[in-house]
Amino acid sequence: MIFVDTNILYHIIHKTPSTDKALTILEENPGDYVIDTVVHNEIIYASTMHYLEHKHGVKGAYSARKWIKRHGYPKEVIDAVRELIKRLNIRLISSIYTEGELYKVLIEFRLLPSDAIIALTCKHYGINTILTFDGDFKRVPWLKVVP
């Protein structure tokens, strides 16, 4: 299994200057791609915020909540995330960690909570490779960071 981080998916969905690099990373590292519930949440949230800002001028979480309450969840975001997961044949796995493990990894490897959960989930499933532009994962000894 190969873990795909949020930033790789984001650059593919949103056609950024790093899109080609993200696609190349996937092409050069074929395998059984997985994301956990943290990445699934992050890509939906980040894509929603990007969509609302660029299509409707909505900025900030509070304004986004008001917009969604009034107009409903943007189908374009759901469709884009769903299509990418399907196209790349990404499997969704549950995030797994204990409270004690989380605190230990936060402190020992100086990670943000979401990254610590991802690292622990990878450890639990025996995943040793993560595709990401986030250099913080290089501090995690059981993960090989690509690129």
Please identify what each model-predicted range represents.
Residues 1-38, 46-60, 125:
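Short, well-structured N-terminal submotif of metal-dependent ribonuclease cores
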Residues 74-75, 79-89, 110, 114, ...:
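Internal alpha/beta domain cores that form substrate/cofactor-binding pockets in large enzymes
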Residues 4-5, 11, 94, 111-113, ...:
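Histidine- and aromatic-rich ligand-binding microenvironments
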Residues 82-128:
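Active-site neighborhoods of divalent-metal-dependent phosphate/nucleic-acid chemistry enzymes
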Residues 20-23, 40, 44-101:
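Active-site-proximal, substrate-binding regions of enzyme catalytic domains
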Residues 8-9, 39, 117-118, 136-137:
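Alpha-helix capping/helix-boundary segments
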Residues 1, 119-147:
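Acidic, PIN/NYN-like endoribonuclease modules and their adjacent C-terminal/linker elements
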